[in-house]
């Protein structure tokens, strides 16, 4: 008798969209492209000693509520404007929880917080143009 020993915990399969498909569905806007380009140049100048400011990278570690994350980003942007001569503030957020072995795995893996694991929805949600164009 042959015993089933492989993939014993798999309960179903769902195809994950390739990255190029997500990128084609949600192209980056000119406004966001400019923000990323300019921010990277500023950070490079600071790290190479061409500026006296400090780069400050702040969380949250991961997000589960995109609207709350946008509100937080707006507050950081206001703070950065107030401290622009001293600091370059960068918001860093994970959409996954790479070190989590139990529990919720992050917005990409379970966007509805219901163990549905709709990765395609999660990828579209975190790359959605509506939040990215608000700052």
Predicted regions and their residues:
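A charged helix-plus-loop insertion that forms the helical arch/lid used to bind
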Residues: 102-121
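Short, well-ordered coil/turn segments that N-cap beta-strands
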Residues: 52-54, 85-87
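Glycine-rich anion/phosphate-binding loops
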Residues: 64-80, 119-125
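N- or domain-start disorder-to-order transition segments that initiate the globular core
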Residues: 14-47
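Hydrophobic faces of well-ordered beta-strands that scaffold small-molecule active sites
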Residues: 56-58, 89-93
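Single conserved hydrophobic/aromatic residue that forms the stacking wall/gate
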Residues: 126-135
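Polybasic, low-complexity association/targeting segments
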Residues: 1-14
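Active-site-proximal loop/turn and secondary-structure-junction residues that shape catalytic pockets
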Residues: 62, 93-99
């Amino acid at each position: 008798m042959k015993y089933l020993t492989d993939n014993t915990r798999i309960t179903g399969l769902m195809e994950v969209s390739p990255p190029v498909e997500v990128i084609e569905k949600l192209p980056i806007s000119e406004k966001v492209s400019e923000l990323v380009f300019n921010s990277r140049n500023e950070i490079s100048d600071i790290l190479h000693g061409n500026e006296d400011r400090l780069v400050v990278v702040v969380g949250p570690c991961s997000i589960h509520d995109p609207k709350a994350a946008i509100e937080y980003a707006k507050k950081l942007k206001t703070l950065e404007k107030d401290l622009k001569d001293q600091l370059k503030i960068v918001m860093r957020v994970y959409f996954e929880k790479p070190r989590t072995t139990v529990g919720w795995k992050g917005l990409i893996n379970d966007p509805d917080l219901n163990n549905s694991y709709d990765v395609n929805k999660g990828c579209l949600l975190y790359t959605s143009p509506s939040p990215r164009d608000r700052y």
